[in-house]
């Protein structure tokens, strides 16, 4: 069995357990040096997953983070409090790996829901196991979910995820809708070979079920570093595949800092109208309006999905640092955020961590 190393980038502040000095403002919004304000926090709860999508993980053999390196629920609750009350975070999304594999998920959601001002709380999940927990998550304070689903073709699903779990995901979507975790959004990363066919049926399915589809361009975040720009199924390809089957027009509502470009969809008299979005992270990057900050399952702040440096908050927590020191380290990390991800630059270097160990 081939074992793929997880890979950890350069970590700032790991050894000394103290905040890193910078020119970052000491209070107010969580700014970077280009004037962007981070209000959206992505929190990874685990690097483990029960699917094995090829664009994210190898078929087998990925080393997991040791359990003692992962943040516990009390540590997560404290960092959430600092983020919301001191850094101005207004939206918290829990991710993985697969966050439903984190036993303390409901506890952490409840901790976020108790904060004032209360942030919007959402979850990105593969949907396996969601049907059984959707009601409890809603009771804990979860507002809505995004479910990753790349196709509604069972054979294609099994080929992409290396698991035959499509029925479980569909049940999870229905469970989320029944629990009021709406709008239920579907995140799709399209396979270069089957995606043009899959996206037509996937959009039709989402319109019929009342879900909102988001098609996400595949990014260079796979564990095997096999991503190639010339194999990308980009946003223009997606629209070209859909236009023969649906009437599409741009959503006139202001986009703001949202990553998705939204389209209004008319599918004809037999299918409800709706909307869908395309997140063109590669072909039409939106880095200039990015409002995200990221916390990995092992307590590292990443200013960008494609960062090559991380700032260690777990070390600060476990060294007994006060809220002020943790806040300062977080602000320093975000102040150093690059202008863009650089995917289309000839000198681009893929992050050492795969997506499963960063959080989407």
UniProtKB/Swiss-Prot annotation:
Residues 33-251 form the Radical SAM core domain. [4Fe-4S] cluster 2 binds at residues 287, 290, 304. Keywords: 4Fe-4S, GTP-binding, Iron, Iron-sulfur, Lyase, Metal-binding, Molybdenum cofactor biosynthesis, Nucleotide-binding, S-adenosyl-L-methionine. It is an enzyme of class 4 (lyase). PROSITE patterns: MOAA_NIFB_PQQE (PS01305), RADICAL_SAM (PS51918). GO terms for biological process: Mo-molybdopterin cofactor biosynthetic process. S-adenosyl-L-methionine binds at residues 55, 97, 148, 219. Disulfide bonds: none annotated. SMART domains: Elp3. Pathway: Cofactor biosynthesis; molybdopterin biosynthesis. Coiled coil: none annotated. It holds the Pfam family Radical_SAM. Its cofactor is [4Fe-4S] cluster. One of its GO terms (molecular function) is GTP binding. GTP binds at residues 42, 93, 124, 185, 292-294. It catalyses: GTP + AH2 + S-adenosyl-L-methionine = (8S)-3',8-cyclo-7,8-dihydroguanosine 5'-triphosphate + 5'-deoxyadenosine + L-methionine + A + H(+). Signal peptide: none annotated. [4Fe-4S] cluster 1 binds at residues 49, 53, 56. Catalyzes the cyclization of GTP to (8S)-3',8-cyclo-7,8-dihydroguanosine 5'-triphosphate. Monomer and homodimer. NCBIfam families: moaA. Belongs to the radical SAM superfamily. MoaA family. PANTHER family: MOLYBDENUM COFACTOR BIOSYNTHESIS PROTEIN 1, MOLYBDOPTERIN COFACTOR SYNTHESIS PROTEIN A. This is GTP 3',8-cyclase. The lineage of its organism: Bacteria, Bacillati, Actinomycetota, Actinomycetes, Mycobacteriales. The gene is moaA.
